[in-house]
Each structure stands twice: as structure tokens, then as C-alpha cells.
Amino acid sequence: MYMWRERSKEEKHEDVVNTGLLPLDVVEGFKIRPGFFRMYGACVASNGVSFTINSHGATRCTLLLFKPQASKPYARIPFPDSYRIGDTYSMLVFDIKPDEFEYAFSFDGPYEPAKGLLFNEENVLLDPYSRAVTGQRKWGEKPEVGKDFEYRARVVKSNFDWGNIKQLEQPFEDLVIYETHVRGYTKDKSSGVSAPGTFAGLKDKIPYLKDLGINAVELMPIFEFDEMESARVVDGVQLYNYWGYNTVSFFAPNTSYAFNEEHNHEGDELKSLIKALKENGIEVIIDVVFNHTAEGNEMGPCFSFKGIDNNVYYMLTPDAHYYNFSGCGNVMNCNHPVVRSFIIDCLRHWAIEYRVDGFRFDLASILGRDQNGAPMANPPILESLAFDPVLGKMKLIAEAWDAGGLYQVGSFPSWNRWAEWNGRYRDDMRSFLKGDDGMAGNAITRITGSRDLYSPESRGHKASVNFMTCHDGFTLYDLYSYNEKHNEKNGWNNTDGDNNGHSWNCGAEGETDDPNVNGLRRRLIKNAFAALLCSRGPAMFFAGDEFCNTQFGNNNAYCQDNIISWLDWSRLEEFKEIHDFVRHMIQFRKEHPILRKMTKPSSCQFPEISVHNGTPFNASTDYKTKLIGIMYAGRNEEDTEDDIVFYCMNAYWEPLVMQLPVLPNGKHWHVDTNTNAEYFDGEDFTAKTELLGVNTIRVPARTTIILVAE
């Protein structure tokens, strides 16, 4: 870590601590003195570099210095006993230049696996606070030197000029979040970018995102991870740790996502992307994985936390084995005071150094477990993040479950700060939209804000992040193209991935030339987007859904660094109708604040939200109900007139009739959107709507119609 302050444009933007300190000791030929104890990691000073790290169980710590790419250290500098205060070691080494070395640590101490103690001074250990990691500069290539799991840190001096960029602080409920994978978004040649698969490549797509109406991107893991971890070949195809949910270094951006291979440039390339996104009104939320690390279980490597303080950083069973609530071999001990401080430091680093706007916490329920794995009512780490002064305006989004069976959707400890991926929304809406019986009432509840899970009085309209799709599961196109998952190419005999995705192939498994099947699929995709963007709460969808990207039925593409996971941008032309519909619905959502939040009451005194299942103000449903109507009534953004929207969805396989509420004051219903309308390039989506009277409408089979009062 390092100290940061806002500097004028006239100053150099370099993270250097100016000091007139003089050496006090000489060890192994290096001039040294005690370092900056409150600044963990490597901190550049005007006359050297300070190195600070902590370990409770170690008896000795040694700093290892390497020439870039060298296999052996050129210097081993033990920390003098007087350079340790409590559990923290800190040493300022004079006259070393950041660009000319890489570093690591070794720790000596008891090696007693039965007690969870794994100290071994032969282990080369990565600094947990390292801001850059050496090694896999190019995707898919192992380092030529060192052991498979030997990572080293690089010292970073930043001179990036942010200008006047700051957090955008858009209201949470106004967000349309676009989840994407940095590499997969532009890696395919169809993306047309100059630097495919990189931060720079994603930057080239910002005009596209802005035109679509996106105001927040959620980046799948961008922390340093090892794509070669568990790499294997299946049927002649190289598989990788493609998604990146196996963190190596929490403070460092992933080096292989940088196009520019110059020393320490990955950070600036990421900053340039974030700055450009913000300049275009797009917030940046990053996916963080504090539930486990890439060190795995007892059979996994020891390259950092295990060798520094194994029984501090990880949850261990009474016989010193690793708990596995993550499903990935180990679990971080998030509510231990040391680990809690580490997590807070990390998130502050990304907020300050990279100016991100929020975080999505993978398997966040693990952060709510105590050191023995039991769920806590008020987990200290979650409370600390909710009230941290640096993170006070950050969006905090929880994936409110874990692989150990703890499911907290609607009950995640929030302090009115945390939002949640609403998995109930996904499941209930998928079931209703494909026509399952008994789901109408659930669908109404989900669309209107999931009040059974998130009280608007206590948690507002921001707690439920609504989504139909994410990286985990079918794409939206595949949701309506496959009844079964097709994960054979993952190499596990199709046993991996979710077996209950609530999908429906519309009559043919996979691709088909049947125009009726393809027409129905397109209509269901539009129905899904219409429901999502007319629902209370932030909306999120997976990148490529807006032009029907496919993973060919694979609903667990975590290892597929190929056309299965890469977006095929040629489909943008083929499915322009869907793209234009999504853009239309995002704009419609922006134009009608009543869809997103409570406004002032309408002058006509309609209730803010009312249900009309076939007839006005009929909120009753039964097992066979397939036609639902929801009316939102309030005031427009300027408070100059009423804002009244009627959402109508027929999930039945035959047309049904909807009677609309009578409008006062000379207003009339006008159709804005009809998912059954024939599409003509450049036209709207209102054609072929059959009005049977002033306040009666015929809703075609499996169709959404949206009306506004004018």
C-alpha cells in the first residue's frame, strides 16, 4: 500500500514517499533502516523501497530480491529482530530501483501440519499486498523460470493522470448493469478491435456500450489469477482457468489482460479503461473473490498465504484440514481480524488507486461465517465494509449464497448498504416466462421489487439486483434453445453445471431452421428483457444477450477459452432486431422513473403499483393464471405530469384478453412495446397491436405488451 493524495496537474503523479531518512544498519551489503510499518506491501521512497508484511506464527522473515526473470535471488536480506513490531516486519532498503528487481519473502517457523502451521524457509512467498505480479505476461504461457507456483511481486510507481475523474455515484436503482469477461468480450476476431482480449480491447467497445444505454459494467475477475492452474487438454482442446475465480494476488490487475507488455503497464491500461468508461457515464463494478484463493486444499500449492500464516488466513477444521464452503478447496477466514483488515485494505486500494465504483462479492455468504464456519448474525467484515469511510459510496453487491448450502437471498446482513443478486428473481421469472403453472403470483412479486424479500421501507428499491442471466448458466439465447445442458467439452461427462436452469428449447434442441421455433425464441428473449427492464430494482444482464450470443448449450463455460465463451460479434447483424429491442427498452426504462423507484403520487390518485390480472385491479391468481398486468403510477422526472405505465404479459400458448384500467382526465392508453410486432429496421415495436375497445386489448400468445397513458 502507499499514501495517495490529489495532486495538481502541474505535479508529477508519482507514488513516492519523500524522506530524508538515513540508513541505520548494513545487512548483506545493503543499507537499511526500519520501514513504514503502517504501509503494507512495497512502498517507493525517494531513496529506496520500504517492505512491510505481517505474520503471527513466524519466527523469522527474509526479503528475497531477484533480477527480472532470474531463477535465483541475487539477495537475501533477513529482517533484523528490531525491525519487527508485534507481528509486523518492516524494512526500508536503500539504493534499489523499482524497475530493476522483483521480490518475494520467505518465513521460518514451526512446521506442524496437524496444527495448521506450514512454515518453511525454502518456500518463495508472494507478498499478499503485491500491486503487480511477474510471470505470465502472455495468456496461456507458463513462466520459463522458477517452479510452477513460484510468483514474485513487482514494485509499482504510478504516474497515471486521472484528471478530474471521480466516482459517478449514480442512484443504485437507476443502474443497467452489463456483466462481461474482459478477455472473452473482444477476443474473437469478429469484435473488430485492435487489441482483442485485453483492457484496451474493451475500451474500444465503449461507444457501443454507450449507444446501447449501459450505465454500469460488472467485470468478471480482473485480479491476478493463473489461467494455467488446472489447465488440461480434452479432446485435443486446451482448457484453462478461463473465468478467473481463483485469485493469486488481490491487489494486482491480471497481467495477461494488458495489451502493452511494457514493465508495470497493466495497471495504467486498466486505469485508462476505467477513466474512459467514467467519462462516458458508465460506472465500473468489479467481481471480487474473497471466499477462497488459488492455493487450494492440502494437495494445493503453497505460494503465499499458506506459508505466511496458514491458520490465520484460512478456516481450518479441528484437525487442521481446510473447510470447503467455496467448493474450490479452501475458505478464507474473512472474519479473523487480520484477514478482515486485509480485505478492507484491498478494497480501499481498488477504490483509491483504480477509482472503481463498486464490488460484486462472489459467494458472499462465506464472508458471513465465523472462524469455525458457522453463520453469524452480524458478521464483522460485512459491517465494516458497510460503514467504512473510504468505501462509503461504493456499490456493494452480494452473491448471497455459498457452496456449503448457506442461502441468504433476502436475508443477507445488509445495514441498508448491501444489495444482492436476486436468484429468486431469476428462477421465478424463467419459470413463468416459459409457461410453468403456479408461477404468476411469484412473477408479480419479483417484477414489483420482491417485497417478500426486500422491504422497500427498510431497504429501498436498490437491494434486489434483478437478472435473468449471468456468466454462471445459460446465455439468454441458449435458455430458449436447449432443454438440457451440453457441457461435454468441459471433460466431466456432462456432470458439471446446473441441472435445473428452467430452460425451454421451444420445440427443437439447439440450432434449427424452423421459422416458427426461431420466431418463438426471439419473442421469448424480448419478453425476458421487457420484464427485466420493467422490474423494480437495478437490472443486470450478461454481455452478448442483446444479440443472442450462444455458448452452444454449455451452462458452465468456466474453462472454455474459445468460441464457446468468446462473443461472436457477427451475430449483432443477424439479431439486430433483439439488439434494437434491448436498446429501446433501456431507453424506455430511463424515460419512466416510476419503473425504477417511488415518485410523488400521481394526480389521478392511482396507487403506485397495482395488479390487474385480466380485469382492472384484480390481484388474484390461481395455479393456471398465465396473464398478468402491472400498472405503475407516479410522476415524471420533472414532476410536470403523471407517469403511468402498464406492463402486460401473456405466458399462455393462446391469445388472451386484458381489460385495462379506465384513465381519468382525458388520457388514453397508447401501446409503446409489443414483443409480437413484426420488426422493420429502424421502426419501433408497436405494430400489430389489436385494440378491442378503448380499454381492452388482445394479447397474442407468449407476448408482452407495454402501454403508457398519454
What are these regions (language model features)?
Residues 130-134, 355, 368-372, 377-543, ...:
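Conserved alpha/beta catalytic core and glycan-binding cleft of carbohydrate-active enzymes
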Residues 201-204, 217-218, 265-272, 284, ...:
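Generic recognition of stable, solvent-exposed alpha-helical segments in well-folded globular domains
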Residues 103, 107-164, 227-247, 252, ...:
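Core domains of carbohydrate- and sulfate-ester-processing enzymes
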Residues 176-178, 217, 284-286, 359, ...:
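Hydrophobic faces of well-ordered beta-strands that scaffold small-molecule active sites
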Residues 2-178, 183, 204, 209, ...:
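Carbohydrate-interacting/catalytic domains
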Residues 181-356, 363-390, 406, 453:
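Substrate-binding/active-site clefts of carbohydrate-active enzymes
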Residues 100, 112-116, 186-188, 225-229, ...:
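Short catalytic/ligand-binding loop motif for oxyanion handling, primarily in non-cytosolic enzymes
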Residues 59, 215-217, 357, 538-539:
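Short acidic/polar active-site loop segments enriched in Thr and Asp
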